[in-house]
């Protein structure tokens, strides 16, 4: 009797599990509104790794010895839906000899694959043509085109023993990434850059990167704009290198005091990441268009831990050259990370303008002056 009851209980449990969501085939990440990214670095301002302060002044980050563009010709394979994609194409041993070349950045519809669609306010896939009715977060499966991208690259010798980051500036609309056959992560969001630390995935000599790109994803429901609906890698792909203790992020505040709109109010916050055996410091210099230093300071990074937030004391700078549309005056900010001996280990920076915007007496003002909008 007990054995028969036990068998009935197990049979019932099996039936329940068979129809439970856990037993059902899981939806892929590109069909989920929660899978917006995996293993990505935190968003931050652009921290271009220049070699010298002179390079910062010139502002041409693409000429930095610590920047490597992956734009250009990639091997490419296009299919009508996910079931037809080459599932193991990311493996270095996979043969791509019969694949075509495609230019990156560039949408695949503009290079002979699929069809570009223009709509203004509706979802392009919510149409009889695709036999699909909008059901967020799901998108069509049978017509969800997939592009498989591959290319090789070599890391400069000067990057040895440094950190290496991969950045994809914009890929429509969902993609997985592999380096040397090793899974890196994924991203969902066509117009947002995504970065991954790939230092431990690199090899000496030639390396291989692979992207599997899906035309539509759950994120496509948030990208319904008055525009052409296109697919693929449409913005820059590149690598950059930093020391293992590096400037991860910084924030500049630069406005005018509102009494006479003459003096500048300057603030700077910097985030340093990466463990260090030794002490270090972070220094900034702010120079005007003639190269004169208007402010400078250096603060020790007391902690040797993984993350340090440094807030420089705010400063009031007398009689700055304000930024406006008529007179777009700019200053140059230099940031230098130093080791315990005072040696500069990383240099970055940006242009800075002093400007204040406000509603004053019912009018929109820039630097205290009303403008027409």
Task: Briefly describe each language-model feature range.
Residues 29, 60-61, 77-79, 107, ...:
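Accessory beta-strand-rich segments of carbohydrate-active enzymes
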Residues 1-26:
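Bacterial Sec-dependent N-terminal signal peptides
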Residues 25-69, 73-75, 82:
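N-terminal pre-domain segments of enzymes
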Residues 210-212, 332-336:
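Extracellular recognition modules
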Residues 74, 181, 237, 331, ...:
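Conserved, mostly hydrophobic/aromatic
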Residues 159-163, 202-206, 316-330:
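Short glycine/proline/serine/threonine-rich loop/turn segments at secondary-structure transition edges
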Residues 177-179, 262-302, 308-310:
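Beta-strand-rich binding/interaction modules
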Residues 251, 334-373:
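N-terminal carbohydrate-binding accessory modules
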């Amino acid at each position: 009797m007990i054995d028969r009851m036990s068998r009935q209980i197990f049979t019932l449990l099996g039936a329940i599990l068979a129809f439970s969501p856990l037993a059902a085939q899981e939806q892929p990440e590109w069909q989920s509104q929660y899978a917006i990214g995996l293993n990505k670095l935190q968003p931050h301002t652009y921290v271009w790794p220049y070699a010298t302060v002179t390079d910062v002044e010139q502002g041409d980050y693409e000429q930095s010895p610590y920047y490597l563009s992956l734009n250009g010709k990639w091997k490419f394979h296009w299919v009508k839906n996910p079931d037809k994609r080459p599932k193991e194409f990311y493996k270095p041993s996979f043969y791509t000899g019969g694949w075509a070349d495609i230019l990156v950045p560039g949408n695949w519809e503009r290079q002979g694959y699929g069809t570009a669609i223009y709509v203004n306010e509706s979802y392009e896939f919510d149409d009889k043509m695709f036999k699909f009715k909008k059901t967020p977060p799901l998108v069509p499966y049978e017509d969800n085109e997939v592009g498989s991208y591959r290319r090789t690259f070599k890391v400069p010798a000067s990057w040895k023993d440094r950190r290496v980051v991969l950045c994809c500036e914009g890929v429509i609309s969902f993609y997985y990434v592999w380096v040397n056959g090793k899974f890196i992560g994924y991203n969902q969001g066509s117009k947002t850059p995504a970065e991954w630390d790939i230092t431990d995935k690199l090899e000496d000599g030639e390396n291989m990167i692979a992207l599997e790109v899906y035309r539509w994803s759950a994120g496509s429901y948030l990208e319904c704009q008055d525009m052409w609906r296109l697919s693929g890698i449409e913005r820059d792909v590149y690598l950059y290198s930093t020391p293992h203790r590096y400037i991860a992020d910084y924030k500049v505040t630069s406005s005018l005091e509102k009494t006479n709109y003459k003096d500048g109010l300057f603030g700077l916050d910097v985030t340093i990441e990466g463990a260090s055996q030794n002490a270090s410091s972070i220094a900034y210099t702010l120079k005007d268009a003639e190269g004169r230093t208007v402010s400078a300071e250096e603060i020790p990074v007391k902690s040797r831990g993984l993350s340090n937030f440094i807030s420089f004391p705010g400063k009031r700078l007398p009689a700055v050259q304000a930024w406006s549309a008529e007179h777009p005056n700019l200053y140059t900010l230099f940031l230098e990370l130093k080791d315990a001996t005072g040696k500069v280990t990383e240099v970055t920076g940006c242009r800075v303008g002093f400007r204040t915007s406000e509603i004053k007496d019912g009018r929109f003002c820039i630097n205290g002056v009303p403008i027409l909008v």
